[in-house]
Amino acid sequence: PAVNQNSSIKDVIVEITQKRLGLTAVLDENDTLKGVITDGDLRRMLEKGNDILNTTAKDIMGIHPKTIEGDALAVDALDRMRKNNITQLIVTEDKHYAGVIHLHDLIREGII
């Protein structure tokens, strides 16, 4: 799941909902990773009463997403997830978005 940093909140919600991972990467025009938005970020935005119609992805994204390079070992992904108490990592290749790896992917592949 990925959206442009200038995407509307509606587009962010649709992307997160359709991809069913609870997050979306936020990219610039060159597909460079700029941040991440989780379903929790959306809930916090709503709690604050932000103007949804005039808010964009870059306004609410976390700017330090947890990432892993595409050529990393699965065991390294698992270790990073455990250390950060998270279930997903954004996969990058040379700072460009390549996808998301979820804990369930590691379970399905027999890593854990």
Q: Where do the language-model regions lie?
A:
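Short hydrophobic beta-strand segments in globular cytosolic domains
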Residues: 33-34, 92, 97-98
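Short beta-to-alpha loop/turn elements within the nucleotide-binding domains of ABC transporters
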Residues: 37, 55, 72, 101
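Nucleotide-binding motor/catalytic cores of P-loop/tubulin-like NTPases across gene-expression machines
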Residues: 35, 39-41, 50, 54
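Bateman (tandem CBS) regulatory domains
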Residues: 54-65
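Histidine- and/or cysteine-centered catalytic micro-motif in compact active-site loops
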Residues: 29-31
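The conserved cystathionine-beta-synthase
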Residues: 3-20, 27, 46, 67-87, ...
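Conserved active-site beta-strand-loop modules that form the wall/rim of enzyme catalytic pockets
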Residues: 21-25, 34-35
